[in-house]
Curated annotation (Swiss-Prot):
Modification type 4-aspartylphosphate: residues: D53
Name of the protein this chain belongs to: Response regulator PleD
GO molecular-function terms, A-Z: diguanylate cyclase activity; GTP binding; metal ion binding
Binding site for substrate: N335, D344
Pathway: Purine metabolism; 3',5'-cyclic di-GMP biosynthesis
Function text: Response regulator that is part of a signal transduction pathway controlling cell differentiation in the swarmer-to-stalked cell transition.
Active site: E370
Enzyme Commission numbers on file: 2.7.7.65
Cofactor(s) the record lists: Mg(2+)
Length: 454
């Protein structure tokens, strides 16, 4: 996974070392030797991640980080502060400045690439969310999901047989999050399938294999996307590498530093929240794309795609497909007499009656205006005619109540019915025959059903 990384340090040897390591892993690297240059490059180039040394003359890393986070152009870019080994105060100040994470000198390669990979994935989600929100603003849709999702605590499952360590982690997280401790990996798997935002697992647990537990989470559909942080001893490089290979999102080096814990937990929970929002938003967008907003039925676009595949299957020897084309009688008169708001009420009520009188396998759609279509898979013409007659009677049998009960309208419909005719038939021909049936039904006085054989 490649990314564009800006490395900022006033010591050239440090810059060149990081540049060489990152370039060898196919990252695109740019460099700056001071704060003002870094700010200008960040605003101009919009890198994916910024690695920023704390101790720089003139403008230190904290000031640079604050300025990046104050600028709407760059505030979304994750910043990793590079601190001294004993820099607890630096990490506290870094969090206050808006840093996403930390690296400690001397920089360990495994931790460097774990941090970069984790934040690169996070940045991809941020970019997608920002793009969706920009599109929403252009379309006049209320945006601001990222702001609403930020700052929300999460439910964190701590899987650890070291009770003292688990309690310490839970105490650190308890102010902002809702930690739950589980020492039994089998019970933890069940818990992970529930409303959990993050799992923290002891990769070096004595009574169970933490890496095997993580692999099991990744193999299950319901927990595959769940973020996992692994607690690993800093000198256990083999376990670190293996944890990352099997799908751990990031590493927590023991003993656990409270600021690093806070930063890493925040990043993973934010990423999950953003991803869940995007996934739900996509599902909603897909639903909107195939749904008529007035009636709640499928729209013409969706109907066309489904009809194409059903007719193709029928012409290749499958069961017949029938189509009902329905037109509300004198609908223009309803609009002209009572207004378009009442007309919309009639359309919504008709859609409810239509949907309640077709089978689960049928596809009722709004075709346009006052025209509706029902696609009926595996249905011969005679069966479709019976269903069409039932719909007609259900519509005409009782008045439509509109205008909050102040008006009662008698509504009737004309229905044309057709069915596929075997090899050579097309969706267009099927609907054309149904349309001819509607024309004949109206010519005969309306409130009628007419079938049209091929």
């Amino acid at each position: 996974m490649s990314a564009r990384i800006l490395v900022v340090d006033d010591i050239e040897a440090n810059v060149r070392l990081l540049e060489a390591k990152l370039t060898a892993e196919y990252y695109e690297v740019s460099t700056a030797m001071d704060g003002p240059t870094a700010l200008a490059m960040a605003a101009r180039d919009l890198p994916d991640i910024i690695l920023l040394d704390v101790m720089m003359p003139g403008m230190d890393g904290f000031t640079v980080c604050r300025k990046l986070k104050d600028d709407p152009t760059t505030r979304h870019i994750p910043v990793v502060l590079i601190t001294a080994l004993d820099g607890r105060g630096d990490r506290i100040q870094g969090l206050e400045s808006g840093a996403s994470d930390f690296l400690t000198k001397p920089i360990d390669d495994v931790m460097l690439f774990a941090r970069v990979r984790s934040l690169t994935r996070f940045k991809l989600v941020i970019d997608e969310l920002r793009q969706r929100e920009a599109s929403g603003r252009r379309m006049g849709v209320i945006a601001g999901a990222a702001a609403r999702l930020d700052g929300l605590g999460g439910r964190v499952l701590i899987v650890d047989d070291n009770e003292r360590q688990a309690q310490r982690v839970a105490a650190e997280l308890g102010v902002e999050h809702r930690p739950v401790i589980e020492s039994d990996p089998e019970k933890a798997k069940i818990s992970a399938g529930g409303p959990v935002d993050l799992v923290i697992v002891n990769a070096a647990a004595k009574n169970f294999d933490g890496l095997r537990f993580t692999a099991a989470l990744r193999s299950e559909e319901r927990t595959r996307q769940l973020p996992v942080l692994a607690m690993v001893d800093p000198d256990d490089r083999g376990r670190m590498v293996k944890a990352l290979e099997i799908g751990v999102n990031d590493i927590l080096s023991r003993p656990i530093d409270p600021q690093e814990l806070s930063a890493r937990v925040k990043t993973q929970i934010q990423r999950k929240r953003y991803t869940d929002y995007l996934r739900n938003n996509l599902d909603h967008s897909l639903e909107l794309a195939v749904t008529d907003q007035l009636t709640g039925l499928h729209n013409r676009r969706y109907m066309t795609g489904q009809l194409d595949s059903l007719v193709k299957r029928a012409t290749l020897g499958g069961d017949p497909v029938s189509a009902l084309l329905i037109d509300i009688d004198f609908f223009k008169k309803i609009n002209d007499t009572f207004g378009h708001d009442i007309g919309d009420e009639v359309l919504r009520e008709f859609a409810l009656r239509l949907a309640s009188n077709v089978r689960a396998i049928d596809l009722p759609c709004r075709y346009g205006g006052e025209e509706f279509v029902v696609i009926m898979p595996d249905t011969a013409l005679a069966d479709a005619l019976r269903i069409a007659e039932r719909i007609r009677m259900h519509v005409s049998g009782s008045p439509f109540t509109v205008a909050h009960g102040r008006e009662m309208l008698n509504v009737t419909i004309s229905i044309g019915v057709s069915a596929t005719a075997g090899e050579g038939d097309t969706p267009e021909a099927l609907l054309k025959r149904a349309d001819e049936g509607v024309y004949q039904a109206k010519a005969s006085g309306r409130n009628a059903v007419v079938g049209k054989a091929a």
